[in-house]
């Protein structure tokens, strides 16, 4: 059984790059919205691109023990009873950083993880059952990944304007606060802050910059250009030829 699933990730054990929406075990790049076990790049694990090193935490707790080497990475058994964040830093007991979590695999109750080692740390230097530590703030309770007693809240009844993304919602969709759909905060195609038709910058019809029928050279018959009537702007070439 494949743990990672494919790039489409619809219900795979880990999901894939497109996971997160199909109940995959790990989720994919889309984060933890779809019940993914791990959250992917940009998921609840944070990290990813744009992060920075905050230094060692004030406290570290045991998260797992070394199992075996896999190429340049190491594979560990999770002994914490919780689920670590993706990309969470891993330390020795003295808070020296070993690397960062790369993969999480297994079931919510029994799982392990792989660690991409920091520069200068060799996978061959680890002995069996070597203990590894983590910031306790980078662990999540297993209950978060188990089915809820009531089966969870259904999807019915949200409609347009619901709390997750109808028109005018605060999370996305058309008119969403953060995603910039139609009329969104960041601007979208129609009525957005940044442009589009009738937008703040103006667009094709009636916009701020002028369009058809505008003042400064639109396609219609505006005030700036003179029509073909022999006016002063046309010169000799614009005069009508009189035939006797």
Swiss-Prot record:
Q: Where is this region: Disordered?
A: 1-53, 145-244
Please state the protein's primary subcellular location. nucleus
For this protein, the record's Gene3D superfamilies field holds:
Probable tRNA pseudouridine synthase domain
| Region described as RGG-box 1: spans on this chain | 4-51
> Does the record bear Ribonucleoprotein in its keywords?
yes
Origin, by domain of life? Eukaryota
Fetch the InterPro entries from UniProt: Gar1/Naf1_Cbf5-bd_sf, H/ACA_rnp_Gar1/Naf1, Transl_B-barrel_sf
Region RGG-box 2: list its residue ranges.
153-222
What does the entry list under GO cellular component? Answer: box H/ACA snoRNP complex
The question of whether Ribonucleoprotein is a record keyword is answered with yes
Q: One matching Pfam family, short form?
A: Gar1
Ranges of Basic and acidic residues compositional bias?
160-173, 218-228
Q: Which protein family is it in?
A: Belongs to the GAR1 family.
Role according to the record: Required for ribosome biogenesis. Part of a complex which catalyzes pseudouridylation of rRNA. This involves the isomerization of uridine such that the ribose is subsequently attached to C5, instead of the normal N1. Pseudouridine ('psi') residues may serve to stabilize the conformation of rRNAs. Involved in phase separation into sub-nucleolar condensates. Essential for normal development and also plays a role in fertility.
Free-text comment on this protein's domains from its UniProt entry? Arginine-glycine RGG-box regions play a role in sub-nucleolar compartmentalization. Dispensable for nucleolar accumulation. Both regions are essential for fertility and development.
Assembly mode: Component of the small nucleolar ribonucleoprotein particle containing H/ACA-type snoRNAs (H/ACA snoRNPs).
Annotated protein name in UniProt: Probable H/ACA ribonucleoprotein complex subunit 1-like protein
Please name the gene that encodes this protein.
garr-1
């Amino acid at each position: 059984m494949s743990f990672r699933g494919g790039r489409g990730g619809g219900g795979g054990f880990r999901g894939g790059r497109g996971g997160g929406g199909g109940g995959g075990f790990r989720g994919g790049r889309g984060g933890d919205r779809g019940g993914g076990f791990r959250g992917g790049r940009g998921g609840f694990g944070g990290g990813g691109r744009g992060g920075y090193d905050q230094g060692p935490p004030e406290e570290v707790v045991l998260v797992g023990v070394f199992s075996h080497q896999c190429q340049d990475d190491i594979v560990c058994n999770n002994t914490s009873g919780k689920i670590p964040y993706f990309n969470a830093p891993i330390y020795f007991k003295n808070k020296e950083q070993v690397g960062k979590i790369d993969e999480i695999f297994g079931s919510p109750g029994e799982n392990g993880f792989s660690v991409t080692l920091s520069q200068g740390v060799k996978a061959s230097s680890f002995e069996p059952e070597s203990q590894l530590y983590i910031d306790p703030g980078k662990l999540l309770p297993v209950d978060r990944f188990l089915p809820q007693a009531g089966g969870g809240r259904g999807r019915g009844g949200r409609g347009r304007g619901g709390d997750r993304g109808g028109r005018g919602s605060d999370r996305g969709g058309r008119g969403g606060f953060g995603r910039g759909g139609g009329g969104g905060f960041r601007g979208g195609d129609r009525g957005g802050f940044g442009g589009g038709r009738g937008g703040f910058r103006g667009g094709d019809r009636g916009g701020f910059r002028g369009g058809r029928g505008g003042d400064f050279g639109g396609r219609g018959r505006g005030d700036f250009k003179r029509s073909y009537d022999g006016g002063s702007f046309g010169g000799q070439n614009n005069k009508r030829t009189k035939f006797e």
